[in-house]
């Protein structure tokens, strides 16, 4: 396998008729180590890597990670996600593979449904698939720890917790200085947080003005500061940040404890409302013994979700 320090091409911009550049035209050096290319979300090394590995391998692993590749054009643009339709749930499932040591568990919204008496009406049957070896997974986490310490996710780093992950930004077709989609995905050994920011349809009236390193990262940090205190707080014991391994110190300002407490207060309010929703849901499900009542229960759920 490749070393996390492997130097990748950061200069080739033309592959036949396909032209590519780094976001905002950034090009620091002709080559960059792989850990830096990933942490800084550089386009040129990603496309160069896809070109070296071959599109068959790229598509094979896209499918292994649960992505629908059937209608995606077989071009190098796929290295940047072009043509791949996905959502936060699918991406949480994919990145959960790294958090689980290379094993992907199928994502689901409901683990089980109980009635008001506590009886289980329906439960989810977990399916697990090994996608990567443990050693490969460790290398990926080594590099993705750098996203939050030195890369495009420094503004998303939560207080008191170490996360690994990736950011992503798509340019609009009508203005390269504007963006249509912004992703921030982070994980610990306990949890994956997958966030997308954008509009259902991007056009000249609906767009974002910065990259995922800006507003999207600030939102992610608030969410992470709220969620992580309720996890086990498991550390990445078997891996080390690739930047630290190369003697490079973290950059950016660390989130303060005050910020974390404010975010946690917001989450407590959400948690209380969610608990009330669960109690109401149990009652609605227990009473939904005929089609008409079942429909009322479903309408109640849709109302909570804002549909």
Identify the meaning behind each predicted range.
Residues 1, 12, 38-42, 49-53, ...:
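Sec/Tat-exported extracytoplasmic proteins
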Residues 3-4, 86-250:
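A penicillin-recognizing enzyme superfamily signal
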Residues 2-58, 119-146:
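Conserved catalytic neighborhood of penicillin-recognizing serine enzymes
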Residues 62, 299, 303-307:
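Periplasmic/cell-envelope proteins involved in peptidoglycan metabolism and beta-lactam response
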Residues 30-34, 42-49, 54, 58-61, ...:
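Stable alpha-helical elements in mature extracytoplasmic
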């Amino acid at each position: 396998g490749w070393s996390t320090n492997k130097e990748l091409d950061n200069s080739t911009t033309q592959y036949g008729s396909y032209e590519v550049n780094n976001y905002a035209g950034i090009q620091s050096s002709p080559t960059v180590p792989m850990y830096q290319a990933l942490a800084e979300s550089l386009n040129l090394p990603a496309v160069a890597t896809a070109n070296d590995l071959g599109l068959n391998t790229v598509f094979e692993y896209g499918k292994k990670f649960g992505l629908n590749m059937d209608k995606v054009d077989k071009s190098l643009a796929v290295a940047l996600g072009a043509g791949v339709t996905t959502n936060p749930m699918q991406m949480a499932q994919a990145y959960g593979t790294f958090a689980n040591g290379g094993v992907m568990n199928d994502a689901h919204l409901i683990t089980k449904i109980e009635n008001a008496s506590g009886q289980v009406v329906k439960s989810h049957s977990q399916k697990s698939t090994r996608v990567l070896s443990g050693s490969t997974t460790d290398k990926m986490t080594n590099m993705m720890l750098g996203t939050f310490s030195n890369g495009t996710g420094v503004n998303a780093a939560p207080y008191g917790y170490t996360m690994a992950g990736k950011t992503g930004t798509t340019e609009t077709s009508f203005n390269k200085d504007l963006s249509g989609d912004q992703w921030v995905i982070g994980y610990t050994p306990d949890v994956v947080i997958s966030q997308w920011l954008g509009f259902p349809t991007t056009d000249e009236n609906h767009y974002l003005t910065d990259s995922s390193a800006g507003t999207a990262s600030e939102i992610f940090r608030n969410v992470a500061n709220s969620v992580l205190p309720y996890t086990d707080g498991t550390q990445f014991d078997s891996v080390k940040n690739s930047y630290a391994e190369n003697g490079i110190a973290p950059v950016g300002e660390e989130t303060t404890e005050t910020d974390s407490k404010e975010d946690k207060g917001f989450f407590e309010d959400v948690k209380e409302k969610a608990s009330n929703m669960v109690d109401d849901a149990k009652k609605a499900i227990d009473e939904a013994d005929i089609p008409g009542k079942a429909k009322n229960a479903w309408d109640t759920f849709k109302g909570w979700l804002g549909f």
